[in-house]
Amino acid sequence: MLFLGDMSIPNSECGEKLIADMKACGVFANQTVIVNLEGVLHHENPKDTFWKVYNDRSAIGLKSICKKVIFGLANNHIYDYPEQIQPMLSLLEEEEIPYFGIAEKDGTFSPLEFEENGVEYAVFGHCWEVYTKTNRNTQTDDRIVDCSYQKLYRDVILYMNSHPGRKVICFLHWNFDMEEYPFPAYKKLAHDLIDYGVEAVIGNHAHCKQEIEMYHGKVIAYGLGNFYMPDGYFFDGSLRYPAESHKTVGVEISAGGGILLHEFETDTPDGAALKLIETVTLEQQKELLRPESQYNENAYEDFFKKNRIKRKITPIFNTYDDSIGNKLRTSYCIWKINAIRVLKQYRDKHQR
């Protein structure tokens, strides 16, 4: 089973190139691939891409080169084109492509259940509510999973108690853009999930690679980076990422629990969509298997405070409970991001 980061395919030409390059990499053919579909499958290349991200329908073609492809939908850009959510879900069902991360209209949710090599799995998807509340769906009643982290933890535990033979994986859309380190709260949440028996915790959204750690024999990948989000197409062509965002990693988990890391270069300067750099064990990957993974909670809080990238009047989440303090921090983040969006959108509109 192979987990990949954020994917946004702007048009059929890019989709065909990506699929051809994936095939040439030689690591996808016999895999169940789980990838974050960053943005809806759009029925046509949209003309309005101002501050929006989507996927061309050529993304469906991934199923032709993999044993199975599964799309994670719990991300904020699904709300960029709300009118396309139901057509997307219908298309995925028609194409027999499993997906997860969509909530019921009342906010309740269930994992995707499937079988792999005789082993039963369940995958939970979740998006940090800061992002769904700064990019709201005001057009339809479709919802992605964005409950509080405390509720997510409790619901995962309830599910595991009622499904004791099933291996559970959590696929989480969290953290700030370009933040290299997970919040201390994310460490605690991931550790608590593993302590209760979750098989793996996989994170996305930061658009850069983050730490990967082995905790009690289970893998936690806090951020896989951009699997494929090419520069110069989205946000009316203005969305571009720094060089470090063009390196990404795929985490392969075998039925026996073995871990391989597939390191890729994506959207390369020479025009390739994807190139395989190397495949290594986690123990061989010193860049991602970082010393701070061995820190205790207090030491990591100090490390994060000193080394975090996002600093300007930005709160730190040290716990994931529903405390008043965390609710205030969350509300402040929502206010700050909304204010920044308004200012940047005003600037960008007048530069078009």
Where are these regions (language model features)?
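N-terminal active-site segment of His-dependent metallophosphoesterases
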Residues: 1-54
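Active-site neighborhood of phospho(di)ester-bond hydrolases with catalytic His/Asp-centered motifs
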Residues: 3-5, 32-38, 68-76, 99-103, ...
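Active-site environment of divalent metal-dependent phosphoester hydrolases
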Residues: 10-13, 41-44, 76-89, 105-111, ...
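A short C-terminal boundary segment appended to hydrolase-like catalytic domains
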Residues: 11, 238-352
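Binuclear metal-dependent hydrolase catalytic cores centered on His/Asp/Glu-rich metal-binding motifs
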Residues: 11-23, 115-168
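Active-site-proximal segments of metal-dependent phosphoesterases and phosphodiesterases across multiple
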Residues: 44-65, 166-198
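Conserved beta-sheet core of the metallophosphoesterase superfamily
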Residues: 67-70, 184-249
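Extended active-site neighborhood of metal-dependent phosphoesterases/phosphodiesterases
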Residues: 70-142
